[in-house]
Amino acid sequence: MAGFWSKLFSSEEKPSSAQTAKDRLKVIVASEQGLGRRLSQDKIDQMKKEIMQVVSRYVSGVGEQHIQMQVRSEANIEMLEMNINLPEER
């Protein structure tokens, strides 16, 4: 996991800013067990609103329809996966 963060924030040759933004905005929070039981749909919706408010400070045109969040299981790990589709610049 440390390799992931060091790649995002290292001072070596950097990928395009669009790719960096995409990588930073795709967030996966993993838990060994019980994430789905701890996060109700109301909590996910509230988290979505708060994330939208933060992102909209830096990127114009981002709304709730641009943020997708889901809880899924993979290899006995439950994950909260979030994707933010940035609108085209006008």
UniProtKB/Swiss-Prot annotation:
The keyword Cell cycle applies. Residues 1-21 are annotated as: Disordered. SUPFAM superfamilies: Cell division protein MinE topological specificity domain. Keywords: Cell cycle, Cell division. Residues 10-21 have a biased composition (Basic and acidic residues). GO terms for biological process: cell division; regulation of division septum assembly. InterPro entries: MinE (IPR005527), MinE_sf (IPR036707). Gene3D superfamilies: Cell division topological specificity factor MinE. The keyword Membrane does not apply. Belongs to the MinE family. HAMAP family: MinE (MF_00262). Prevents the cell division inhibition by proteins MinC and MinD at internal division sites while permitting inhibition at polar sites. This ensures cell division at the proper site by restricting the formation of a division septum at the midpoint of the long axis of the cell. This is Cell division topological specificity factor. It comes from Acinetobacter baumannii (strain ATCC 17978 / DSM 105126 / CIP 53.77 / LMG 1025 / NCDC KC755 / 5377).
